[in-house]
């Protein structure tokens, strides 16, 4: 369903496939992978399917709409909980070239991706299809450029882990030995 969120935590292993069905028009989506810390890599997998009506929204007086997928914005909490990275995940649709301040926890790394129109982020122009890494700070200022179209972006922030990352195919672990064990488990039907 348009506007839905699928949130999967792979943990010790999760085999899945995605086969979205398109009725008409253009279908698109965002796929985001968030690393787990070493202590959580072998947790049981879990899956959450969140329909659009269960994603809270904040609407400002000037018509800006903020969908709160994870974390908290303007005292509204998103439906995703219990994630070690303590993510902030917002879908922001700016109304009428308006400006919006978004607080970012000082403990988090963050990025923004403009998926419609173009926006200014802390004074820098970001065009459609561009992703920007955000520097440290307590907040960013987002401003739309157009009064005739919807300038939109996703903003994601999360607490970084000071741990090594080893990746091979679909596996992400902390050591080469853990990768070898994950491959062994997958080949032997243990996930």
Region annotations inferred by a language model:
Residues 1-191:
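Jelly-roll (double-stranded beta-helix
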């Amino acid at each position: 369903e348009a506007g839905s969120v699928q949130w999967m935590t792979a943990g010790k292993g999760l085999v899945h496939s995605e086969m979205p069905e398109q009725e008409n028009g253009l279908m698109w989506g965002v796929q985001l992978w968030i690393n787990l810390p070493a202590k959580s890599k072998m947790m049981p997998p879990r899956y959450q399917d969140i329909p659009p009506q269960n994603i809270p929204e904040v609407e400002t007086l000037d018509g800006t709409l903020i969908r709160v997928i994870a974390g908290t914005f303007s005292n509204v909490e998103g439906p995703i909980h219990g994630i070690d990275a303590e993510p902030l995940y917002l879908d922001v649709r700016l109304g009428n070239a308006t400006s919006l301040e978004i607080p970012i926890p000082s403990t988090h790394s963050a990025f923004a991706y403009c998926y419609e129109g173009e926006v200014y982020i802390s004074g820098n122009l970001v065009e459609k299809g561009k992703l920007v890494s955000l520097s440290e700070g307590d907040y960013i200022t987002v401003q739309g450029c157009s009064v005739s179209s919807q300038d939109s972006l996703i903003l994601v922030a999360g607490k970084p882990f000071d741990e090594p990352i080893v990746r091979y195919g679909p596996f992400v672990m902390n050591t080469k030995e853990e990768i070898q064990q994950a491959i062994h488990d997958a080949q032997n039907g243990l996930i």
